[in-house]
Amino acid sequence: SEFETRVQNAQAMMRDANMDALLFMTEREFTYFAGFQSNFWQSPTRPWFLIIPAQGKPIAVIPSIGENALSISWIDDVRIWASPNPKDEGISLLAKTLKSLAKSRIGVPMGPETHMRMPANDVTMLRDVLGAVQMVDATDIVRSLRMVKSAREIAKHKHICGLVSDAYETMGARVSAGMSEREILAAHRLDVLARGADTVPYLVSTAGPDGTDDAIRYPNDRPLIAGDVLFIDTGAEIDGYYCDFDRNFAIGQASDATK
C-alpha cells in the first residue's frame, strides 16, 4: 500500500542517517504514516506516539481510548496506557518501547514548521530515561518524503481545491449588500461542506471600502455596503489533504481604485 511504501522509504533514509527509529507525535505525521484520522487530536491532554523502527511496520503508543479506533488502520502493533494519567501520560511505555528498538539515535522532527506535541517536562523526562540514546533532528527525512506527492495525493489536492473553487464561483449569487461577514461565512462554510469537504478548519474574512489590509481576523456583524470589497480565505480538508486560498468580491460596483 501507499503507507507501506512511505514507511519503507523512511527506513531507507533512516539507515543513511544512522537512525535506529523515528518518533512522531503530531497529527499530520501520524496520519501520513498510519492512515488514521480523528478529531481527538483536538484534545491537548493525551498525546499519541508513532514509532517507525529500522525494519518492519510502525508501532503505535497511544492512550487506551484510541485502541478500538486505531484497529481499522494498517497498524497492528498498538501499545496502550490507561489515560488520562497526568503523572505518566504514556512516557514510561514510550521510553520502554524506544529503548527496545534504539541503541544510539532516534529521529524526531525538530526543524521549521514542527513541534513536539507533549509537555516540555515530559520531553525532558523522556530524554533522561533514554540516557545515552540521542534524540536527533529528522526534519529533512519527513520533508523529503512529503515533498514528493503520489498520483493519489495529487488527485486529493485537486479535488479539495476544486470543491472550494466551485463554492467561490457561486458566491456572487449568494452575497449582497446588507449581509454581514458572519452571515456570509456561515453560508460559505455550509456550501463547502455540502460539496464534500470533511472540515473547513480555517475560514476568515474582512471587508471595507476598497478592501482592508487585515487578512486574519474573525468576521464581524457589520452589514456590508456598496463599495466594500470582501476578502475571504478558505482552508478546507478532505481525507487529510488541505487547500488554502482566497478570493476578493466587490459589493455592487468596484471603484476605479480597486480595479
Task: Tell where the protein language model's regions lie, with residue ranges.
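Active-site neighborhoods and metal-handling regions in enzymes and metal-associated proteins
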Residues: 1-259
